[in-house]
Amino acid sequence: VSVEVRYARSFLRDLKSLESAAYQQICEVVFEKCLQIQGIQDLPELHPIGSDALFYRFTIDNYMVGIEVTGHIVKFVRVLPKPYL
């Protein structure tokens, strides 16, 4: 069973606010490469958020992408700059 990809309004809003180079890079990963994955384990640097295995994050360059996983549905929720520690 392949992954069904959806996009939250908050994700699309975040995406529109990015500077041009980051926008291009994230669009390439999210709208092209993610449609070809077989499972979420194929996403780069995937980490669970919390212990319920519903929300995850992964990084693309200097940005964190938040996703919600329900069965075979992956919903992109947010894309935000990585915090500098």
What would you call each of these model-derived segments?
Residues A22, H47-G50, Y84:
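Generic low-complexity, intrinsically disordered sequence content enriched
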Residues E19:
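Long, charged/polar, surface-exposed segments that mediate recognition or autoinhibition
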Residues S2, R9, R13-K16, Q24, ...:
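Enriched for short, Lys/Arg-rich terminal
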